[in-house]
């Protein structure tokens, strides 16, 4: 998940440097979304993870 977030962040930074506003905004939004989903999944797995028998 975090790898995808970093990839979208890099795409957003490159698009912003080249002046593609719409693409940069979309890639930044996707990076934020993937980051938040990754954090939520991490917290869920932290609390409901593997338990000892």
From Swiss-Prot:
InterPro entries: DUF1328
Organism: Enterobacter sp. (strain 638)
Record-stated family: Belongs to the UPF0391 family.
Any Pfam family: DUF1328
Gene Ontology cellular component terms for the protein in this record: plasma membrane
Superkingdom of the organism of origin: Bacteria
Keywords of this entry: Cell membrane, Membrane, Transmembrane, Transmembrane helix
Subcellular location: Cell membrane
Record-given protein name: UPF0391 membrane protein Ent638_0536
Predominant location category: membrane
Membrane-related topology note: Multi-pass membrane protein
TM ranges: 4-24, 27-47
